[in-house]
Amino acid sequence: MSGTTVLLLTCLFLVTMATSDCDLYDDSCTGTEICCTPPGDYQGNCMEGEDCPSGGR
């Protein structure tokens, strides 16, 4: 792989890490919020259950 490809993948990984509040293995949501994850993904964002279209966990 070229250096540019590695750099792009690293940036993509960092952005992905920064935008997810929680994952199904480390649910850091507080109160009544659940970890709302897109179907097939284990990372998601904390939100109220009724606001989560995929059902979360």
Swiss-Prot record:
Coiled coil: none annotated. Residues 1-18 form the signal peptide. GO terms for molecular function: toxin activity. Expressed by the venom duct. It is found in: Secreted. Keywords: Disulfide bond, Knottin, Neurotoxin, Secreted, Signal, Toxin. It comes from the Eukaryota. Its main location: secreted. Disulfide bonds join C22-C36, C29-C46, C35-C52. GO terms for cellular component: extracellular region. The keyword Disulfide bond applies. Probable neurotoxin. The cysteine framework is VI/VII (C-C-CC-C-C). The presence of a 'disulfide through disulfide knot' structurally defines this protein as a knottin. This is Conotoxin Cal6.39. It comes from Californiconus californicus (California cone).
